Amino acid sequence: MIPDVSQALAWLEKHPQALKGIQRGLERETLRVNADGTLATTVHPEALGSALTHKWITTDFAEALLEFITPVDGDIQHMLTFMRDLHRYTARKLGDERMWPLSMPCYIAEGQDIELAQYGTSNTGRFKTLYREGLKNRYGALMQTISGVHYNFSLPMAFWQAKCGVTEGEAAKEKISAGYFRLIRNYYRFGWVIPYLFGASPAICSSFLQGKPTTLPFEKTDCGMYYLPYATSLRLSDLGYTNKSQSNLGITFNDLHEYVAGLKRAIKTPSEEYARIGVEKDGKRLQINSNVLQIENELYAPIRPKRVTRSGESPSDALLRGGIEYIEVRSLDINPFSPIGVDEQQVRFLDLFMVWCVLADAPEMSSDELLCTRTNWNRVILEGRKPGLTLGIGCETAQFPLPKVGKDLFRDLKRVAQTLDSIHGGEEYQKVCDELVACFDNPELTFSARILRSMIDEGIGGTGKAFGEAYRNLLREEPLEILQEEEFIAERDASVRRQQEIEAADTEPFAAWLAKHA
């Protein structure tokens, strides 16, 4: 089932320097909660500056949903320590609040009024909040409070020069984009390995079902927790943040222009379902528009091709201008065993897997096959640790035992690990392979199995409160290592100033501005 990568690996072993200079970044979302685990109803802390313009600390869907962002970094330890400093500083500024350590929230009642993230009075800020109003009205606010970790990854130019002979200009843009699309297609085919190893949301609180019937064979604990005994990541299931209305958009990952055309089509395609919500009611705007996607960011995807946008530029226009610059991996649950929601083992594994995905052959993929890849993901998400579980290839009928496929994949990853270790010295990447491959013979070692044991004993709420309290105490005590208090204060003040400048520069009323942007 695993493609034959032996030639590509032999090439890599002859050109190890092609991997020198991998760049990464991390984003981590987390809810601010009170000591009893309920959602904080306070505004974004003043000490953290403006959520609209702060470089490292912002908000996602809700006012209480923090998002931490590291700068692009070539050094794993430095990036993780930077992320830890953001957590350390924030933990000291949250008063009695703490950061929820799980992907799935718990103490949020059905229909509870969840304050949307606020970004000030500028047209840009109001647009961001209106987009969130649309998400709330389309999918429900509860779904939007699920948190995850995003891992951004790019290969050095030396890789593309050695692999594809690229120089500069239009041809380089096309070749590099084609290489990243190959990575993405392999990710759709084999990325289920991420929830298998690192999924950490095997259970949900009953409020998540919102009284709706479900066909999933949930088991229920006395405290009202629902779980699937072999599930890995319910966050990635249809109970979590997915969008069924997007499944027939026909967006594919074979070619840059084809992908962008699909994305642009989706933001212009009217939706009957969302038209029923209405765009405005009693003078209040309910969504940006009633199309399948309000804006491009609404496209639900476990991985995204990206390029840093210029002012006023859409993500797809940035891709057309310069091609794919980096990849955003979006399938990581919060790691409940780390105070910062992610750890070094995961980052090193993702490095290995991304390199494998870009090396392995990846035939072009129709939108039908893309839908078929979802079958493997769903199996792993809902019953990944089940003995005897099998996986298929695309829409074909042949089945393969998951542990065998996993071990075959790791045989290749071990060779990538040897190459990366040869550049950096040490055996860190190989060690990660040895630790993780054991999860295929013993699923009890996976994150989902480990956290489920705690959840069955303590409930989701009890587990979240205990871990959150321990991490709060730890982070508040630890000294800052990379950033200093003065730098946080300077960025707080600068971010507030930047927001004020944006607000002062606005010249037209929001309604007129929106008419041009909706």
UniProtKB/Swiss-Prot annotation:
Designated gene of the protein: gshA
Protein name per its UniProtKB record: Glutamate--cysteine ligase
E.C. number(s) listed in UniProt: 6.3.2.2
Family to which this protein belongs: Belongs to the glutamate--cysteine ligase type 1 family. Type 1 subfamily.
Enzyme class: ligase
Biochemical pathway: Sulfur metabolism; glutathione biosynthesis; glutathione from L-cysteine and L-glutamate: step 1/2
Disulfide bond entries: none
InterPro entries xrefs: Gln_synth/guanido_kin_cat_dom, Glu_cys_ligase, Glut_cys_ligase
Keyword Phosphoprotein: no
Molecular function per GO: ATP binding; glutamate-cysteine ligase activity; metal ion binding
Keyword Nucleotide-binding: yes
Annotated Pfam families: Glu_cys_ligase
Origin species: Salmonella typhi
BP term (GO), one: glutathione biosynthetic process
Reaction equations catalysed: L-cysteine + L-glutamate + ATP = gamma-L-glutamyl-L-cysteine + ADP + phosphate + H(+)
Any one cellular-component term (Gene Ontology): cytosol
Alphabetically ordered keywords of this record: ATP-binding, Glutathione biosynthesis, Ligase, Nucleotide-binding
